[in-house]
Amino acid sequence: MPIQPPSKGTLYIVSAPSGAGKTSLVRALLERVAGIQVSVSHTTRAMRPGEQNGINYHFVDVATFERLIESGDFIEHARVFDNYYGTSRAAVQALLDAGQDVILEIDWQGARQVREAFDEAVSIFILPPSREALHARLAGRGTDDAATIARRMRDAVDEMSHYDEYEHVIINDTFDHALDELSCLVHAQRTRMPRVQAEHAPLLAALLSRVEDVE
């Protein structure tokens, strides 16, 4: 059997309209499945109460962000709700090379850019069960006025119009069921032939070694 290269992690792209429950699903996935983590993005938006720099985001000013764009530091970047967001190329590659699975929580624009750089990335889109449910979730946050909610709904419809650019779609109607589907996708990816051959090369070599004849 040929020697396999070191095992590398899988890159997951997870997108959804605001209010579809993507963040909650990903957080629950991290608690359920080992060996996977979310990439910490850069952003120019203001830090919210309870957030920590380097944990939730790398918070930078616009000038710094634009310098990082010019130097090619980002796999993807986009402007969302009047703020920049971007993903560090070096940070993601280092995690993948170490065999860590990585999740990118990004919008459809960023997803297109990532697929160009990582053609083996697994893309997943989270949809709400209905527009009414999505509106109720956005309004239920209690942090936005009616005009802001209306704008977020328009942006959500635009985001959802790109669902068919993704390999997998999960409808988040019942949270536990959606989480099961997301977990199954990760576990199934870990049983794909190239990864199994890389991670279990010694076992496979031992199983397939020649059995000596018994006199």
From Swiss-Prot:
Its EC number is 2.7.4.8. GO terms for cellular component: cytosol. It catalyses: GMP + ATP = GDP + ADP. Residues 9-187 form the Guanylate kinase-like domain. Essential for recycling GMP and indirectly, cGMP. Belongs to the guanylate kinase family. This is Guanylate kinase. The lineage of its organism: Bacteria, Pseudomonadati, Pseudomonadota, Gammaproteobacteria, Oceanospirillales. The gene is gmk.
